């Protein structure tokens, strides 16, 4: 029987780890292990992001004693866990407008401050109860129209079917990350040891917790 993962009510430092420590050895995992062990005076919370649980075997590293909290989330299992009935829905107009504003800001090359202000608004609304919910992304008319517009304006090579499913696969996990950000225990510092989805999770935490 495997040992239960440690859980805590709070920690000093949260490390956001994507496809690395403690399930993968070498490289980034080695220095993560070294960092944690170098600071025994700090309590660490580890958030591991992986593809699917079946892609990982046992831990390759024993968790140091100062890891007081460990949680793991699998990005592509959200497709299997999402049991939403497809149904016609217009979509939330405020949520659609926020996404369009953020996309337009990136296209215009707005200043970092302007784009981050819009990202802050989007991040807040992706949390449970916000106006940007997974159901609308998957099934709403507004989301469909946005994908169609982007494809017409910017995609000349891949088929629309490829574009549509790639968009779903890439973006659907963001709502899982919103739930992770909402539920993470209080910490004093967050460090993203990986970019990609872990970096996005770090951005969500920065913009939803301050």
Predicted regions span which residues?
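Short amphipathic alpha-helices and their capping/turn segments at secondary-structure boundaries
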Residues: 2-4, 203-208
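A conserved catalytic-core segment of Leloir-type glycosyltransferases
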Residues: 8, 45-177
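Extreme N-terminal starter segment of soluble prokaryotic enzymes
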Residues: 9-13
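A short, glycine/small-residue-rich beta-strand->loop->alpha-helix junction that serves as a flexible
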Residues: 19-30
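Short amphipathic alpha-helix
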Residues: 28-39
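Short, well-ordered alpha-helical microsegments
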Residues: 32, 197-201
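A generic structural motif
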Residues: 39-45
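Short N-terminal targeting/anchoring amphipathic segment
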Residues: 182-197, 208
């Amino acid at each position: 029987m495997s040992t239960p993962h440690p859980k805590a009510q709070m920690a000093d430092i949260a490390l956001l780890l994507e496809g690395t420590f403690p399930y993968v050895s070498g490289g980034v995992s080695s220095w993560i292990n070294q960092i944690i062990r170098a600071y025994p005076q700090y309590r660490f919370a580890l958030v591991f992001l992986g593809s699917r649980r079946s892609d990982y075997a046992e831990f390759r590293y024993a968790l140091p004693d100062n890891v007081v909290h460990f949680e793991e989330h699998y990005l592509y299992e959200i497709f299997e866990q999402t049991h939403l009935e497809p149904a016609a829905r217009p979509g939330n107009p405020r949520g659609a407008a926020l996404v369009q504003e953020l996309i337009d800001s990136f296209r215009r090359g707005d200043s970092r401050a302007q784009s981050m202000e819009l990202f802050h608004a989007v991040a807040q609304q992706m949390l449970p109860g916000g106006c940007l919910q997974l159901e609308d992304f998957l099934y709403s008319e507004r989301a469909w129209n946005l994908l169609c517009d982007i494809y017409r304006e910017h995609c000349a090579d891949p088929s629309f079917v490829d574009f549509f499913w790639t968009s779903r696969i890439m973006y659907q996990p963001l709502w899982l990350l919103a739930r992770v950000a909402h539920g993470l225990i209080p910490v004093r510092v967050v460090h993203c040891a990986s970019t990609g989805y872990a970096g996005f999770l770090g951005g969500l935490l920065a913009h939803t917790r301050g």
